[in-house]
Amino acid sequence: VIMPDLRAHGLSDKPHDPVHYPKDILADDQFALIDHLGLSDFDLGGYSLGGRTVARMLAKGCRPRRVVISGMGLEGLSDTGKRAGHFRHVLENLGQHERGSPAFMAEAFLKTTGGDPVALLRILDTFVDTPIEVLRTFDLPIGVICGDDDTDNGSASALARTLPKGRLIGVPGNHMSAVIKAELGMAIRDFLLEEGI
């Protein structure tokens, strides 16, 4: 299992200069990693922004054996502006969000992960919508694995219905809680190891 930190996340570089954040750079970074590692037969998956990155890779021609798009719904891929707007509001108003609000919770998460607000704002400028007609061309097995109470990025069931071989797999939790539950990892494992798909 290879789990890279996306640009501006985790241990990856967090440059501030906008020149380092062209459209679709997160997908392009992953193509470069695949090329660097010489991978030719692989599965591909991602959670939330990682799921959006996977969709962009598919839109740009990547064809892994199987795919997991997790923590993501149809609107989070086809209309990225809404989610980008939410995070732009969070990042541009740090310390000013009402306690318990979605923006407050997002800011708290950023603090616990050591997120760099300037670099993360730049990431929002890299987002590219994946139109529904493009999603309908993703003709390979795709597990849409999402928390049963997660609507942060739109409808996971609508996404699964849009994909020719999409399958909705629900796990307990919402966008922030599902990612830390064992059920998510088990659902990903089971989908990738399932025979006959």
Identify what each model region corresponds to.
Residues 2-43:
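Active-site loop/oxyanion-hole signature of alpha/beta-hydrolase fold enzymes
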Residues 6-10, 74, 174-177:
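Alpha/beta-hydrolase active-site loop signature
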Residues 44-46, 70:
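Short beta-strand immediately N-terminal to the catalytic nucleophile in serine-hydrolase-like folds
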Residues 52-95:
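Flexible "cap/lid" loop of the alpha/beta hydrolase fold
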Residues 107-131:
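Hydrophobic, aromatic-rich cap/lid helix
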Residues 138, 144-146:
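Short beta-strand/loop motif that positions the catalytic acidic residue
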Residues 146-174:
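Conserved loop-alpha-helix segment in the C-terminal half of the alpha/beta-hydrolase fold
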Residues 169-197:
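Catalytic active-site module of serine/aspartate enzymes centered on a nucleophile-bearing elbow/loop
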